[in-house]
Design a protein with these regions (language model features):
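Bacterial N-terminal signal peptides that target proteins for export
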Residues: 1-6
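Hydrophobic h-region of N-terminal signal peptides that target proteins for export
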Residues: 10-18
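Glycan-processing catalytic domains of CAZymes
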Residues: 23-336, 340-359, 364-367, 372-425
């Protein structure tokens, strides 16, 4: 990593946070470089917005992966029925920041949890995301949520006709966009929870002009004659003491996908905890300080390789704060870092899971400016000062533990140093 990359990361942190408060300067401190609002203070399942590793998420998949990586977006924040997380989902500038943040992590596109064209601010957020995807060369798609048909069913109207109306709107207003998610040239439409309704899927297909691909959830999608593809999700209801990460759910999905010619979209997640949701049922998949994130991403490698590629993968979710699945604010890897200088040598200690740190960066201070003085492998714990590329006569040094992709970065705090004399922070 070059000095320019380090500077770019911290400058992006400043850009992300500029709308909400004081700007952080290039320094040995945690600066929010995410699209999460600094007003959000975190919860049991979600870290406060922090300094997040922007290493590409793809690097956690199998070697040679060409998998398209998507994430699910919830468009409802700012609605009084949901938690206040410090931003509105129908804020144009906020949506722009979110797309930029997703791109910076190596995400290919976003799939919106869509409630139809008459869903008010949720629909407005969806439209904003489409326009921002077009502007930033990003992908965008919609997933029709079961909630879009709830009122129709309550009134006793025909849910198939209501779905047809929604999907015709999507065809005209979304699927014609150059940013829309496509496989083999055909737009992809996803469905979430619609299995609870009696829908004439053949009639749906006949009524849609652009002949979209239908993607259904879970491994049963591969046996569904009405579908063209299946996507994995997160299954906290299957978690158990013997399977705390719900990995058997993923194994079942990938195993079924292997014997099907339908398009497979795997999944990876940090964990699950719906204690902040008004509809919560106490379901939990423990994050295990980032281990669940690493394990679910690597699981695809048991079934796919550079010779047999997984077409796509979805991360549930970008911003479901209420079910504790969001990665927007960063994944807490429970790391703590301390450093000192003794006998002309910079030394540091790390507490927390070592496999959640990708590498270390040593920063050196000149006045108010910090520059990169060294980049070191994750197993390193010290370096002679003579080996630093920046050796001012009087300086402060700092060690940054750069997390694995989308995990929090951690800083030691400045270690004051003068030639021939050193102090602990």
């Amino acid at each position: 990593m070059t000095r320019q990359i380090i500077a770019g990361i911290i400058l992006s942190a400043i850009a992300c946070c500029a709308q909400d408060g004081p700007q952080s300067t290039l320094a040995c401190e945690v600066a929010n470089n995410t699209s999460g609002s600094p007003r959000y203070r975190g919860s049991k399942a979600n870290a406060p917005p922090g300094n997040v590793s922007k290493l590409p998420i793809r690097s956690l998949l199998y070697p040679g992966s060409q998998t398209r990586i998507y994430t699910r977006y919830m468009p409802w924040f700012g609605d009084s029925h949901h938690r206040d997380i410090g931003y509105r989902s129908d804020d144009r500038q906020q949506v722009a920041r979110q797309v930029a943040d997703m791109i910076s992590r190596g995400i290919s596109g976003v799939i919106v949890d869509w409630y139809g064209p008459n869903s008010g601010s949720k629909h407005e957020s969806t439209v904003l995301l489409m326009h921002e995807a077009e502007r930033q060369n990003f992908e965008f798609g919609i997933s029709e949520d079961a909630g879009s048909l709830a009122e129709c069913q309550k009134r006793g109207c025909n849910v198939t006709e209501q779905l047809t109306s929604d999907l015709r709107y999507a065809a005209e207003h979304f699927e014609s966009s150059p940013a829309y998610v496509r496989f083999d040239g055909r737009p992809a439409v996803f469905f979430f929870g619609l299995e609870k309704y009696s829908i004439d899927w053949r009639r749906e297909r006949r009524s849609l002009p652009l002949k979209p691909l239908f993607f259904f959830r879970n491994s049963g999608a591969f046996n569904n004659p009405d579908g063209d593809g299946g996507y994995a999700w997160i299954a906290p209801e299957t978690a158990s003491p013997a399977d705390p990460m719900a990995m058997q759910y993923l194994d079942r999905f990938y195993s079924k996908a292997q014997s099907s010619n339908k398009i497979a979209m795997g999944s990876a997640y940090k964990g699950f905890d719906d204690s902040d949701a008004s509809w919560g049922k106490g379901r939990i998949i423990d994050q295990q300080c980032g281990q669940t994130w690493l394990a679910t991403l690597s699981q695809a490698g048991r079934f796919y390789s550079s010779r047999r590629q997984l077409p796509a993968l979805i991360i549930p979710t970008w911003n479901d704060y209420e079910e504790g699945t969001e990665i927007e604010t960063g994944i807490d890897n429970c790391v703590n870092l301390q450093a000192s200088v003794t006998d002309e040598r910079l030394t540091w200690t790390l507490s927390g899971p070592k496999n959640t740190v990708d590498h270390y960066v040593v920063l050196a201070q000149h006045g108010r400016q910090w520059t990169q003085a060294a980049e070191l492998p994750s197993e390193t714990r010290s370096i002679p000062l003579s080996q630093l590329s920046d050796q001012p006569e009087t300086s402060a040094l700092c060690v940054e533990a750069v997390g694995r992709p989308s995990m929090l970065n951690h800083f030691s705090g400045p270690v004051q140093y003068s030639a021939g004399r050193s102090l602990k922070p």
